[in-house]
Amino acid sequence: MCIRDSSKSGNTLETIVNSNILIKKSDKNIFITENKKNYLNSLAHKLKSEIVHHNNFIGGRYSVLSEVGMLPAELMGLNSKSFRQFNNLIKNQKYLNALISNVGSTINLIKKRKFNSIIINYDEKSQNFFSWYQQLVAESLGKKGKGLLPVVSNMPRDNHSVMQLYLDGFKNNFYTFFYVHENNTPKINNKFILPSQNFLKNKNIQNITYAQKKATENVFTKKNIPFRSFEIKKRDEKTLGELFCFFMLETILIGRALKINPYNQPAVE
């Protein structure tokens, strides 16, 4: 069994607790932390475990494409180089134009006092990705009485809870629709379809959720609710790396426009 412990400071309480619950001396343990005196370094030396030193200028939420994220990716059999095709990104004018356009639109929405960034997520496998997004946006921008509140809604479940508020409640929200095209989703059993629902015949889960997404976007358009939409054609390392970079750069640029430091978290400290 291999346990990988990561903490930039090496003194994060939750990491220390988890370490002492999970780690056994006989395990293969790998520690990722700054090259300084801290708890994880001391524990690693005691266990004679491997230590990967983390650059102290890369904050936790920005470290996803560093060794903190790429070591476990490699252990999972993924290609870390495919995540980090930075040279291709900076030469991709379409990507850069989209980034600049989205930053400008977000700043304009903030000026209109729309402070809630709601993710309308139609991809269950991306829930952890958007947990990272919540930390990125809230911890980077929530300073000096400013910031955005990132909220993640998982669809279609939340159609039956918070969608009423999104459509007809207060108007200080803006939205990001997120969808990943999947080929191998379960298909409906035509045998049990009643005549009133014949339109469901030969459909799979992707057909249905995509139709729900498009219908919801149409309603948002009719009601003049601000939103943007991401449709991912292929789930792979390259695409995920592009998404990580996009949201990190977007957050940094918004922070600069708001004249706040997007890299620290002084109130938490």
Kindly give the residue locations of the regions a language model identified:
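A generic structural motif
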Residues: 7-11, 72-78, 124-125, 182-184, ...
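Structural beta-sheet core signal
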Residues: 5, 31, 119, 175-179, ...
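Acidic catalytic cores of enzymes that act on phosphate-bearing nucleotides/polynucleotides
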Residues: 78-82, 92-219
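C-terminal amphipathic alpha-helical interaction region
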Residues: 261-269
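Short beta-alpha connecting loops at secondary-structure transitions
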Residues: 52-57, 200-201, 257-259
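Glycine-rich phosphate-binding loops that contact phosphosugars or nucleotide phosphates
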Residues: 4-95
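C-terminal hydrophobic structural anchor segments
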Residues: 206-248
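Conserved beta-strand segments of alpha/beta enzyme cores
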Residues: 28, 50-52, 147-149, 226-228
